[in-house]
Amino acid sequence: MSKNISLDEIKKFWPDKAPDINIVQKYIKKYENEKIVIKYGGNVLIDRNVFNNFISDINVLNRLGLSVVVVHGGGPRIKRELDKRKIVSKFINGLRVTDKNIIDTVEEVLIDFNKDIANSLKKLGSQVAMFHTKTDNIIEVKPEREELGFVGMPNKINDSLIHKALNENKIPIIAPLGLGKNEQAYNINGDTAASAIAKKLKSRRLILMTNVEGVYDDQKKLISEIKPFDLENLIKWKVVQGGMIPKIENCVDAVQNGVKGVVILDGRKPH
């Protein structure tokens, strides 16, 4: 438990239907001096009720004194805006091919979503720090590969701004965008961005909230725990396909580079 807050105080803002506070007390103590990076997928947050639950949970973690960093997606919002503008896009191995028209739309949508998350947290009393390509960019990128256009791979994370925000008890809200040469904006896979940030911070946990229960084996059974080598085999054997491939690759990369553990959770479930 946070050293500066009593159990009685916690009970005042503990959400309805959340786990028993007495059960989670030990986890609060366990993580009070650790950093947690939470990536919430845009496919989950398109549902406003789920979005509101997410905002409530992040606010609670912040009030408990935990150091939480939020990285968000925005895929459905991007698709909706591209459709509205009659711009066609395609995917290669789960990554959106991004030309000049598309990157302009992606940047606009993700920054708006970043503001939406920040403003929603502010309404609950949390302090936030927004990070994207127009405000305190923290991700420098290099092009992922030519066929993907303006899709970037994180090359450098300016973690000093993240640490500053956390030290001020602010929640960093990070859009999966970065800048390359000539200040050109690049789209970044949300899981890739979250993994890069978690590695830089050496976070205790990287939590990927998605719109599925988790990762399944070749018998379609949910996997509760798995080692990096076995995850790589799931890709090799084509058990994992599509958009789950970069997610799994980022999980493996994270735990092999300083992150103590990665959890994939069904973000549609409250608390």
Identify the meaning behind each predicted range.
Residues 1-269:
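Nucleotide/pyrophosphate-binding catalytic subdomain
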